[in-house]
């Protein structure tokens, strides 16, 4: 069987901390799973004396780190200064493997249902991972909880939810994280992760429950950190606009040389250029005023952008909302200070232009 032929490891989930009383904690999990020790028994943070809910081990070219980012009463803290976060920082700092795989049941980023409750993970975990990614660590973070597949990327860190065989039919729900999502699929399935013999590449293949491939991605060490782009406006309110709309974004560009291009589209695929060649220096520019008054046809437009550093393949990112371009039905203001006179057979009409506030004579 697979259990006797393959090396398996696991991380504790939210339900494992809900099965016993306060005195016993998640004992059922430790009855059936054995995990490595991180070097000490953290009784102050309520870790079962028979095992660790966060651990690390080396496996070939990969450093495997298991974390507990649940927030139940029997779970260790991961806030700033906590033993778990300090330990994780040390593990990442000292890791000399080609890849770092981090496993945790709860996700840092997710567009599915539970993503709306990951504020603490974003506050404490994400900055730490991004710091080490910027320092040259190649980090893949694997999560669960949602019972579906998703691949997200933010600031040099890939976040993967490989799927669940049972599935949940949960659609994308947490649109706050939509700018980071590269692929989402709610069907039941599973994923395989293969590290190349040289250790320079990692291949992800996602399949449905029948084994049919629906997504693949190759992670490489040679390309360096990819830039990433996050369009923050439009943000999903779909406010109607008649004249211009301010598109806003933030981005991650470790080399500082990438260029940003913006596009609009009615079908989210076949885009038309808005502007090209914008700087990735968000201190200099992080918005663009898009003139839509003469745009035809009127309607709801997708906005997306690409960021290209000239080394990696351009990264495309969609805004989580659309821009609703509508006709301006506001009647023009009437002219003011209207006068007329007749002198020497000539009629002169005068008024003040209400738009430009200047006198007009004919």
Enumerate the language-model features and the residues they cover.
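Extended active-site neighborhood of metal-dependent phosphoesterases/phosphodiesterases
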Residues: 1-89, 93-96, 120, 124-140, ...
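Short, compositionally biased P/S/T/A/G/V-rich stretches that sit at domain boundaries
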Residues: 166, 208-209, 218-245, 325-341
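A short C-terminal boundary segment appended to hydrolase-like catalytic domains
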Residues: 182-232
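Extracellular recognition modules
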Residues: 205, 302-306
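Extracellular acidic, Ser/Thr/Pro-rich low-complexity tracts
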Residues: 248-256, 309, 353-359
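Surface-exposed, short loops/turns at beta-strand junctions within beta-sandwich domains
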Residues: 294-299
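Short, solvent-exposed loop/turn segments at the edges of extracellular beta-sandwich modules
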Residues: 308-314
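Pro/Thr/Ser/Gly-rich low-complexity, intrinsically disordered linker/stalk tracts
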Residues: 328-360
């Amino acid at each position: 069987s697979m259990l006797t032929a393959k090396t398996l490891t696991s991380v504790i989930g939210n339900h494992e901390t809900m099965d016993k009383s306060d005195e016993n904690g998640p004992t059922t999990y430790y009855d059936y799973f054995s995990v490595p020790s991180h070097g000490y028994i953290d009784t102050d943070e309520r870790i079962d004396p028979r095992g660790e809910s966060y651990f690390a081990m080396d496996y070939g070219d990969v450093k495997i780190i298991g974390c507990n980012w649940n927030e139940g009463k029997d779970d260790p803290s991961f806030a700033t200064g906590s033993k778990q976060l300090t330990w994780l920082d040390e593990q990442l700092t000292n890791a000399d493997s080609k890849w770092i795989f981090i496993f945790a049941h709860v996700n840092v980023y997710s567009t599915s249902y539970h993503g709306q409750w990951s504020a603490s993970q974003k506050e404490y975990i994400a900055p730490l991972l991004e710091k080490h990614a910027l320092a040259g660590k190649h980090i893949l973070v694997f999560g669960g909880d949602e019972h579906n597949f998703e691949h997200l990327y933010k600031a040099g860190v890939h976040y993967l939810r490989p799927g669940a065989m049972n599935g949940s039919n949960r659609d994308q729900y947490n649109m706050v994280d939509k700018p980071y999502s590269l692929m989402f699929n709610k069907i039941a399935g599973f994923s395989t992760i293969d590290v190349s013999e040289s250790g320079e590449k990692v291949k992800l293949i996602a399949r449905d429950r029948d084994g049919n491939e629906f997504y693949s991605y190759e992670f490489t060490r040679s390309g360096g950190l990819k830039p990433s782009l996050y369009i923050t406006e439009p943000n999903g309110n779909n406010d109607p606009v008649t004249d211009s709309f301010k598109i806003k974004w933030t981005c991650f560009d470790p080399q500082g040389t990438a260029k940003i291009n913006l596009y609009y589209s009615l079908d989210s695929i076949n885009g038309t250029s808005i502007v090209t060649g914008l700087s990735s220096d968000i201190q200099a520019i992080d918005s663009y005023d898009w003139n839509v008054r003469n745009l035809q046809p009127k309607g709801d437009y997708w906005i997306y952008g690409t960021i290209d550093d000239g080394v990696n393949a351009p990264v495309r990112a969609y805004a989580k909302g659309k821009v609703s371009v509508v006709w301006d039905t506001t009647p023009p203001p009437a002219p003011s200070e209207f006068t007329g006179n007749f002198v020497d057979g000539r009629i002169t009409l005068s008024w003040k232009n209400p738009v430009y506030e200047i006198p007009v004579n004919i």
